[in-house]
Amino acid sequence: MAKYKPAESDRSSIKSKKPKKEVSASEGIIRAELLRNVTAAASKILLPLMLIIVSLLLFIGPFYRGLFFPLELLVANTIIFGLFFIWGLFRFVKSDSRFIGSPLDICLLLLLFSYLVSFLGFAVNKRDALEELLKIASYLSVYLVVLDICRHWSIQLPLRRSKSNNVGIVEANEKVPPGLNLVLHIILASATVIAVASLGVAAGHWDFIGAYAANRIASPMGYANTAAAYLMAAYFLSLALAPLARKMLKIVYLVPAVLMMITVILTFSRGAWLLLPPLAVLMVIAASPGNKIRAVLYMAASTIPALPVAFWIDPIFRSDMPSMAWLPIILAITAALLLGLAAELFLSLENRRKRTVFIFSAAVFIIIVIIFIIIPLVTPISLETKPGEPEQLQSLMQVVDNIKPEGHYKLVLDVKAEMDLTTDTESPDFIWGVKALGEIPGYRSVKLLEHHGQSTSGWETVTFDLETGPETERLSIELYNRYPGTAVTVRSVQLLSPDSDTRLHFIWSRLLPDRFYDRIFSFSRDRNMDRRFELFADAIKVIKDYPLFGLGGGGWAAVYKSYQDQAYDSREVHNHYLQVWIEAGIIGFLAFVGIWVSFTLAFLKKCFIMKAPPSRWQHWTAVFMPVAALGAHSAIDWNFSMAAVGIFLFALLGAGRSLDYDDNFESSINEKKEGSIKKYLPGLIGVVFGLALFIYTLILYSGLQVTWRSQELFEGGNIKQSLVEIEKAIALDPYRAENYHNYNVLIEGQAVRMQNQAELSKMLALAKRAYELEPYNPNYLSRYGTLLLNYVDTREGLNYIDRLMELRPHYLSGYQQPAWSRLSLIEYYFQNDLPGPAMEYYKELYDIEARMQADYGNTRSIAYVIGRAAYLNGDNNEALRYLERVGETDSNYNDAQEIITTITGEDN
């Protein structure tokens, strides 16, 4: 049989097919070992590096004014995006494909996406929108990094319990992420440092800008309310971590808790004070089984000493020796530790003995309250300044609500006043005093009564008549004593009217120091609340106009003055949920709300529905409580505008997300084929975007530095070099409108002097670009409108300038430039014998006046403009009517008087 000879094509086909090289078992083992070594190296180098960087951000960030201002924020963003690049490398070598695995992940990505969309197509301040977008991206980066640190860290803290105790099961069997405890302790330590630093500023040891202002602790972040929210969240973190520690190490967590509680109290943040009680109840509900009683006892152990010590040290901080405040603080810490020790001993007792101890402790507590609080409160009021003591005002106050306007009231009190003067002491003007103030709209007070009394012969009944005005809303009654050697005792204080008999006990004023009573009950409380509601109402107006995509980061600051019903300054909404809606639209708002909703649902599902083991449950509590505290406080303030607080929050979210895993999801990850490209995708994203954003933020940082340098050169008179630097700044940071504005201002003189059309066009283009980047900025709008008016088209320029009345309806500047621009045109046309156009602009002045009267309520500031225009038009009577309204403080007063003199001289 003839042998088969393949065709030429078959031969070529056979030659081209090389047999696959089989990998021997030993080579496979070597490759696997190499992969394990690379992965181990990544864990040993990259993971600790990420932990160090996150720790530095948590510890150092708040000291740089909370990373609120542009320079500090850019530096932080650059570091964070470098951190994100490292995270990408870590994910790549770990071949970890996990990326979106929970509703929280989706909410965070949607939040970032919504800010990106608003920046690209709807931002009214491009530079601020870019800054906010980068800030959200940095928050997400911190979240992902902390999540992986919790997942992959392997070194355990010695503080963690190693065997079963009254919390429950051995922790190793409860699937708690290995790095979670470490991360939470780093977060707690960073907040403890801030608490100590804040108290140290008040004690006079060191100083940070705005850290202790208006006798309120504001922390190195410089804003008291945000400091209160931050430390309140850390307070609950500290108490939630305590049950996870070994034996008596639990009480150590009371030390930071006491420091934080004292600091929160001394921030004088009414919002934080208001939220503490409901959050305390939530803490008990959220605590793991077996730790609910401990939660109550530990909150009591930290609050009972902290509250009186805060009252004690507040005046010490304001004295000549503020450092003496540390002694009461140390006493508070000692008392808290003793109470914590007592709590642990109580929890270790059998149930029968617990009941006995509880009944005994409750009885002792009631007796103490009766002796030290109830009895003093039912005794007569006593105010005394002893002989030899310095002159000082001692007072008690009570605010009375539900006061009838135009009502007749009688203030009746029994008084006993005494005087005991030393031989070298002059007789005082009075021994005691009583004052009544009536609150009227506008947060103003009207004095209805002030009486200075002398000594009495025993008890005397004194009666005062009070007549409230037509707008009086409530009364403030104050009793006081001032001079050494004088004392007054008052009992049975009554406020009588035909309809009611109100007894005044001054209970809260007797319990609380003056500053605390004033902070809680004074008229300023209503002013603060009313302003908050006014902000919220104006925010809703903005949302109604831009509900879908928002206005980009900085949107509220750009437009709020166009929506307000009265003038106020507030670049933040004081409600971060509404602010996100304004900036990122409905998707951003839902995503932001979804962060708390999804996190809460995950906590409820894992702990209350699936019944997580006690230790894992308590870890959930440790991350849930501070997140809930920050979320609640952010409904009344702008905490997350400070990047340091945002980093704090997103580190907590990342830590909490590490607890929210699904066994089926985890196993599906582990079963992925080794060669799948998907497992490298998150790492590639981190490497590419991390590196790109790192470089981009470095460029923006350089642009900011060059911008400032150009301004310094301009102020120093070096115009030529300033222009060179501005061009560099524009190239580095093309969204910064101030550079375009400064550039066109600098070149105007030369362009006009040389009548260079190219330079004039360049000047207009620069002014237009500045306006386009920030169309709600009155300076850029005014500048562009003025240039159009002077060099292009008068009517077009006026149309832009007239927009100032829309942008600033409650500010003088919004009306003055439109009016003065028309006066300039009127003067020009009359000088050139063109009365027709002059009359057109003259009539428009009255339109501006009518609009100003309707929106601003007072047109006196443009009276000179209209009066001069009337004078130029020959209408002397009209000119006098307006010019006589020009006040002496007006810069045009002398000119107005000259015109008046001229007119009256002509008439004579």
What is each residue range found by the language model?
Residues 1-188, 238-254, 276, 280-394, ...:
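Transmembrane signal-anchor hairpin modules in multi-pass inner-membrane enzymes, especially those
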Residues 59-68, 576-584, 619-649:
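Membrane helix-loop boundary segments at the extracytoplasmic
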Residues 256-268, 629-635:
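Membrane-interface alpha helices of multi-pass inner-membrane proteins
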Residues 426-432, 460-497:
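Extracellular beta-strand ligand-recognition surfaces/modules
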Residues 206-241, 271, 319-329, 452, ...:
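Membrane-interface segments at transmembrane-helix junctions in multi-pass inner-membrane proteins
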Residues 249-252, 586-621:
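Hydrophobic transmembrane alpha-helices and their immediate junctions
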Residues 223, 418, 513-573, 577-580, ...:
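TM-adjacent membrane-interface loops and short helices in multi-pass inner/ER membrane proteins
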